[in-house]
């Protein structure tokens, strides 16, 4: 978006059109060809979240990760602030991508399920188990990655704790790291 705004502010419409055709349109063509399993993202009715998920899943696929996306029903809203949700999802997806790339068979999945109780978001990825317990991974300052500050998951936890109707369950099963977030529907 920043690059688009730069073209709009500094350049003419022709430059913006060229940028779109060279950088953005090829991605659309790849999606249309079915190389990516992104068609289910059309079920996300919140543009900011759909854009974030698209960008992360395209990046993961291009990095060589086997990506699975399952969003069977339309989701027109989430019961938390869009910016907060984008921050949490960005952290979870970045971590999932990095961890999956460390494995011999990188895989990750995104499931978003709408039901009467609210929305479930499940992000899973294969990872190399280095023996760090789940409680350590969530501590501020702890990172399994060299040169990282270890604040991502702790920041995500802080955001999630600020909502009394959002629950996060983190589990490890069969070589997969799973983040399962439940966003309960708000009572009106």
Q: What are these regions, as identified by a protein language model?
A:
Residues 155-167:
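Conserved glycine-/histidine-rich ATP-lid loop and adjacent helix of the Bergerat-fold HATPase_c
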Residues 103-117:
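Short beta-strand/loop element within the Bergerat-fold HATPase_c
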Residues 18-25, 39-63:
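Short beta-to-alpha transition helix within the HATPase_c
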Residues 41-45, 67-88:
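Conserved short strand/loop->alpha-helix "switch" segment adjacent to the catalytic nucleotide/phosphoryl-transfer site
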Residues 3-9, 82-106, 159-162:
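Conserved ATP-binding N-box helix of the HATPase_c
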Residues 1-28:
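A conserved cytosolic signaling coiled-coil/coupling helix that links sensory/transmembrane modules
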Residues 119-150:
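Glycine-rich/acidic phosphate-handling loop/turn and adjacent ATP-lid/helix
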Residues 150, 172-180:
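Glycine-rich nucleotide-binding loop
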């Amino acid at each position: 978006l920043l690059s688009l705004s730069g073209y709009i502010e500094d350049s003419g419409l022709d430059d913006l059109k060229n940028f779109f055709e060279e950088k953005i349109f090829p991605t659309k063509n790849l999606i249309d060809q079915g190389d990516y399993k992104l068609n289910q993202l059309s079920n996300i009715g919140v543009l900011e979240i759909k854009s974030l998920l698209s960008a992360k899943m395209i990046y993961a696929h291009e990095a060589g990760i086997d990506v699975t996306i399952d969003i069977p029903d339309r989701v027109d809203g989430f019961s938390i602030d869009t910016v907060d949700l984008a921050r949490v999802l960005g952290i979870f997806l970045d971590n999932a991508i990095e961890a999956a790339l460390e494995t011999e068979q990188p895989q990750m999945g995104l499931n978003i399920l709408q039901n009467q109780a609210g929305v479930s978001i499940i992000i899973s990825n294969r990872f190399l188990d280095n023996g760090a317990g789940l409680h350590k991974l969530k501590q501020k300052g702890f990172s399994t990655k060299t040169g990282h500050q270890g604040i991502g998951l702790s920041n995500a936890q802080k955001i999630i704790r600020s909502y009394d109707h959002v629950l996060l369950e983190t589990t490890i099963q069969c070589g997969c790291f799973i983040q399962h977030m439940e966003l309960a529907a708000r009572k009106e």
